[in-house]
Amino acid sequence: MANYFNTLPLRLQLEQLGVCEFMEQSEFADGISALAGKKVVIVGCGAQGLNQGLNMRDSGLDISYALRADAIAEKRASYKNATENGFKVGTYEELIPTADLVCNLTPDKQHTSVVNAIMPLMKQGSTLAYSHGFNIVEEGMQIRKDITVIMCAPKCPGSEVREEYKRGFGVPTLIAVHPENDPNGFGLDQAKAYAVATGGHKAGVLRSSFVAEVKSDLMGEQTILCGLLQTGSILCFDKMVEKGIDAAYASKLIQYGWETITEALKHGGITNMMDRLNNPSKIEAYELAEELKDIMRPLFQKHQDDIISGEFSRTMMIDWANDDVNLLKWRAATGETNFEKTAPQEAPISEQEYFDNGVLMIAMVKAGVELAFETMTEAGIIEESAYYESLHELPLIANTIARKKLFEMNRVISDTAEYGCYLFDHACKPLLTEFMKKVETNIIGKPFSTSNGVDNTVLIAVNKEIRQHPIEEVGAWLRESMTAMKKIG
């Protein structure tokens, strides 16, 4: 199979990269009707599979799970996930032939073998759904022409899909129809119904393309969403301990600090996050972020270039073929870092203290979010899509670190995201060596300033720069659509 994106002429590459339309609430007035009464069979019952299925069932759809015969016979985790939640479970041969919609929610590396196994069993005119377009775009999977191919891609880990739904909300979602597979023209209606069933319509839905989703998703998760959180966690922890700050305090400040900081980001963008600092700290965080952007920009651009060209996917698929030798080695090494092995203190840290004593973390978030956004839009990805793949998804990933540190983040995200995260981390830490040598505890571990005195002209200029960044402008109106947004409880 050939990389689908690379087979397209430049004109179509740019056209598909640029597909991005924010959908109005009125476009979801039909609810789940396009899928009502149809048999929906989910293949795979991991984090995305189980949690999407729970939401879809609660929304009124007929959901069952098709698993490999050996997974059923051996009562593996996927079988237990489905049966313990009261779902019907059967083999591919038992359930796929009568399915109207088959949702392939297995890990990326299994997609080719899974689709090759289920496609001969799918009935004429049925629909195949993905939540990530890697198999179509990067592997070039060819789907039978009578089958409609759609995507409904929640922009967060599977566990958060369920938690946001239970809170009466949802997570931002991209939907798409594969242009090579929409024989009856009902793909978009089904994709919209899918988004309603998972709750995504309450948080904002972008009509995208398989190409735009893949290229932006890979970029976001490798850089700001996972890669920089890993790099920042390790470097900030080691620096605090080196400078004499109690390791248990440092561990807690970082483990729970990302979540606290990015919750402010979620509700009011970079502006709100920066406004949580006193004026001297805000100016310092701004200047640090500018320096970090200069240092890291070539690395962000390299990741985007390798994603667009297919080089990242090619390299990762070689590791798949080698039984994930690099992925597993890097995962084990992460588990041995001092940050991962140091338990956080039990004493509480106040919400404001996470901001006051985490100026460098805030600077890293600002730099990473803006760089990811800028690099994606320079590559032809539309601003709304770049916003969701950088700023908005970040609090959801930070929440996984709050639960069980980097182990939990890397467990919950896909293997594809995890592999890209390690590539970024391994390149970023050496890049920041000289920068980190200058870091003192006044920007990580202790307050930067107890006074609030600043030069008014400098403060006005900094505030203007923060507020006028394009991600702040697009983010402001996207957040207006999230009327049901609630605080993380």
Curated annotation (Swiss-Prot):
GO terms for molecular function: ketol-acid reductoisomerase activity; magnesium ion binding. The keyword Oxidoreductase applies. The keyword Repeat applies. Residues 209-344, 345-485 form the KARI C-terminal knotted domain. NADP(+) binds at residues 45-48, 68, 76, 78, 108-110, 158. It is an enzyme of class 1 (oxidoreductase). InterPro entries: 6-PGluconate_DH-like_C_sf, 6PGD_dom2, KARI, KARI_C, KARI_N, NAD(P)-bd_dom_sf. PANTHER family: KETOL-ACID REDUCTOISOMERASE, MITOCHONDRIAL (PTHR21371:SF1). Belongs to the ketol-acid reductoisomerase family. NCBIfam families: ilvC, PRK05225.1. Involved in the biosynthesis of branched-chain amino acids (BCAA). Catalyzes an alkyl-migration followed by a ketol-acid reduction of (S)-2-acetolactate (S2AL) to yield (R)-2,3-dihydroxy-isovalerate. In the isomerase reaction, S2AL is rearranged via a Mg-dependent methyl migration to produce 3-hydroxy-3-methyl-2-ketobutyrate (HMKB). In the reductase reaction, this 2-ketoacid undergoes a metal-dependent reduction by NADPH to yield (R)-2,3-dihydroxy-isovalerate. This is Ketol-acid reductoisomerase (NADP(+)). It comes from Flavobacterium johnsoniae (strain ATCC 17061 / DSM 2064 / JCM 8514 / BCRC 14874 / CCUG 350202 / NBRC 14942 / NCIMB 11054 / UW101) (Cytophaga johnsonae).
